[in-house]
């Protein structure tokens, strides 16, 4: 019917796991892209959510952790590990509706992503871009969004330390 055709191309973007280090899951149909950070609690939350969404294939897993204690055990066709990238290098990838760019800094990384005409950004570690970066959506974490201009924020917490100070969305 018409209803299934309409929901067939829906892209879901969700934060799951712990408030301290949430993962981002982008699902469309039976495929997903996972932006991973955190430990075993977040990994289990990702696996549960992928199962709930009926995902059969993780096309890309981007591990945003700067100092992973253990490898991320989520199966994926393709992986990018931020910690393994050289400082000041960029990796780009595309999967279905998702175009992403991962920029590695000395102490962290910036992940910019375009999905369905909307720009998303998430940070890991300590990142201070020299010039402002604009996005419609900040996918929030504990990482302070210095010099990031965003309209809306997807977050698991309203109590990140950076929110209390001067973090008014633009």
Positions of predicted regions on the chain:
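Non-globular, low-confidence helical/coil segments that flank catalytic cores
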Residues: 1-170
């Amino acid at each position: 019917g018409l209803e299934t055709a309409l929901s067939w191309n829906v892209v879901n973007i969700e934060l799951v796991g712990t408030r301290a280090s949430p993962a981002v899951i982008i699902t469309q149909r039976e495929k997903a892209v996972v932006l991973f950070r955190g430990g075993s609690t977040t990994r289990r939350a990702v696996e549960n959510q992928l199962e709930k969404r009926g995902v059969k294939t993780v096309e890309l897993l981007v591990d945003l952790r700067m100092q992973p204690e253990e490898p991320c055990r989520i199966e994926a066709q393709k992986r990018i590990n931020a910690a393994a990238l050289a400082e000041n290098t960029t990796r780009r990838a595309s999967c279905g509706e998702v175009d992403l760019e991962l920029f590695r800094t000395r102490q962290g990384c910036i992940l910019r992503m375009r999905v369905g005409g909307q720009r998303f950004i998430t940070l890991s570690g300590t990142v201070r871009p020299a010039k402002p970066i604009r996005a419609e959506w900040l996918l929030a974490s504990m990482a302070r969004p210095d010099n990031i201009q965003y309209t809306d924020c997807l977050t698991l917490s309203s109590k990140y330390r950076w929110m209390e100070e001067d973090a008014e969305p633009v």
